[in-house]
């Protein structure tokens, strides 16, 4: 598939000059003139990804940008340190177009490195810190990086895996003594050596790649999604629509107060920095969202004055539990996504967010986030009963910049015929594959043409559409309902049963904590249930489902159902099938 036409071909040179706390040139805050985009996308900010953040060093250099425990970094300090790291990387051979593997937990260092890499025109290859050693090695093989910037644990790979050991530049994020022992350069030394340096001037366009992020791999091998500067600018604009800062400021309810954000999503923290607000990094233990201390997080939220909170359901649940019986008075907006958000969490939101807080459910994927959103109040009022009746999870209406189609499910690549994209679409009310296009929808994968063929469709206008792999339908109010992954659909007889719809139905039973619908080898439907000890009654479960018209051939019980390592909330169907599909 040919690359999509560029919507901004004009090269320009980064004009930010930062020495100490010097501000960027005012001229970098221009917007694009309203030139029509050949793909139909609206104009976005002309600023490149790093400029979106560094512009704030000019107008609010003393404002706190990042808070990590007892450490606070201002926008001026952030710009100063980014310039030093960017100069150090460039001085050690990292050039425009190179790739830099970045394996750093959520911390100030993560954002310093990501933005420094962007500033020199290189591409950061973000690898989840909880990745296994083989997954890290695989990412290096795919990316063929010029540099490897990582925590000490990951540097052990340089001796164990040839591909990792061959990376020309190794930078260790941690103690300088460990760096010397590992034969690496310490990130701290890069900063010290180039303290006070000006930000390198590198020509680049908005279409240049700036970030590679891997899909979760829950439905196959992880794919490296390419994000350009334009993509990140559009995604930042979409996230700002969720957070809704403008209407909040216009309302005058908190005059003069700027938001303080806390998010367990790395990309949302980056967006907070683009917005020029304070981002408080959540205090997580080594286990990440598996190790959330809800009471400790509530204390930090109160002490730091957090007003916007976001994370997966697994991250938010302990916070909500700890806040019951009291209110998170300063929190005005909570956004949850990354995995299905239970109806019960939407119902619990009022108890902790009154009097002014609002809870928003966001639906998206690595390739397109956000796609659709719905307020918890609308879930409670309009859609919860249907979810409990097995009709799926309502994720709301599409983002204003998202174009959405529901395509007839297909097992392989799709080709556009004379009728265009609409010729592949299902009829109103039917279940189809959620397929999207827009300025914050990924258009390609790095070095993976097979994945591009399988998940991308180019229509008659040249627009690239992304097939999410999710099955869903639209209701009469234009809301999107998700019923499960197409690949995980269970065919029983002449009828399809969609996992998310059936699982939500089962989870309405008292004591049923989680459920997974899988096909067994005999062609039947098997429900694997994680339930409290006193609730492990297979007859009760099958009768409940049968009453809703869902026949299940067998019920199996598991102590805990496996979930994705990233958000700790999305079911790992592949592992469940391997263990329970006998």
Regions found by a protein language model. Name each.
Residues 74-76, 203, 208-237, 278:
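Conserved AMP-binding A3 loop
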Residues 122-123, 234-307, 322:
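Conserved AMP-binding/adenylation subdomain of ANL enzymes
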């Amino acid at each position: 598939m040919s690359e999509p036409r560029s919507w901004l071909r004009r090269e320009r040179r980064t004009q930010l000059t930062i020495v100490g706390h010097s501000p960027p040139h005012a001229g970098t805050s221009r917007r694009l003139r309203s030139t029509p985009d050949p793909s139909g996308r609206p104009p976005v900010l002309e600023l490149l990804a790093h400029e979106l953040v560094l512009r704030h060093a000019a107008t609010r250099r003393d404002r706190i940008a990042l808070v990590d425990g007892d450490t606070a970094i201002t926008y001026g300090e952030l710009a100063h340190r980014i310039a030093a790291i960017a100069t150090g990387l460039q001085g050690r051979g990292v050039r425009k177009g190179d790739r830099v593997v970045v394996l750093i937990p959520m911390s100030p260092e993560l954002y310093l490195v990501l933005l420094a890499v962007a500033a020199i025109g290189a591409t950061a290859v973000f690898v989840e810190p909880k990745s296994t050693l083989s997954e890290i090695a695989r990412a290096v093989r795919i990316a063929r990086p010029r540099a490897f910037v990582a925590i000490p644990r990951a540097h052990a790979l340089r001796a164990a895996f040839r591909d990792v050991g061959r990376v020309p530049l190794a930078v260790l994020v941690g103690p300088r003594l460990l760096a010397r022992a590992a034969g690496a350069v310490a990130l701290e030394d890069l900063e010290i050596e180039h303290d006070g340096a000006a930000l390198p001037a590198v020509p680049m366009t908005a279409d240049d790649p700036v970030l590679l992020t891997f899909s979760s791999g829950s439905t196959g091998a992880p794919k490296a999604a390419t994000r350009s500067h334009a993509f990140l600018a559009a995604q930042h604009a979409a996230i700002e629509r969720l957070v809704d800062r403008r209407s909040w400021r216009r309302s005058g309810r908190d005059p003069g107060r700027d938001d303080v954000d806390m998010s367990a999503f790395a990309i949302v923290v980056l967006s907070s920095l683009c917005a020029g607000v304070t981002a408080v990094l959540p205090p997580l233990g080594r286990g990440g969202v598996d190790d959330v201390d809800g009471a400790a997080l509530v204390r930090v939220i109160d002490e730091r004055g957090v007003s916007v909170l976001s994370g997966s359901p697994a991250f938010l649940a302990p916070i909500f539990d700890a806040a019951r019986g009291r209110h998170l008075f300063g929190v005005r907006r909570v956004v949850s996504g990354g995995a299905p958000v239970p109806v019960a969490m939407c119902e619990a939101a009022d108890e902790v967010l009154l009097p002014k807080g609002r809870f928003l459910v966001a639906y998206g994927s690595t390739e397109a986030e956000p796609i659709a959103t719905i307020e918890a109040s609308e879930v409670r009022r309009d859609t919860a009963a249907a979810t409990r009746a097995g009709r799926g999870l309502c994720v709301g209406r599409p983002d204003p910049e998202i174009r959405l189609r529901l395509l007839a499910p297909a097992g392989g690549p799709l080709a556009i015929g004379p009728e265009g994209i609409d010729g592949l679409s299902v009829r109103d009310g039917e279940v189809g594959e959620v397929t999207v296009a827009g300025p914050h929808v990924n258009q390609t994968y790095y070095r993976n043409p097979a994945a591009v063929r399988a998940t991308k469709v180019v229509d008659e206008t040249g627009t690239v559409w992304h097939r999410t792999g999710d099955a869903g339908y639209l209701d009469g109010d234009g809301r999107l309902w998700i019923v499960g992954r197409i690949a995980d659909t269970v065919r029983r007889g002449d009828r399809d049963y969609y996992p998310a719809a059936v699982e939500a139905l089962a989870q309405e039973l008292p004591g049923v904590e989680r459920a997974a619908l899988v096909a067994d080898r005999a062609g039947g439907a098997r429900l694997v249930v994680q339930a409290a000890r006193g609730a492990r009654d297979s007859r009760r479960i099958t009768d409940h489902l049968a009453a809703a018209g869902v026949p299940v051939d067998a019920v199996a019980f598991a102590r805990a159902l496996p979930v994705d390592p990233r958000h700790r909330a999305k079911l790992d169907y592949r592992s469940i099938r391997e263990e329970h599909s006998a």
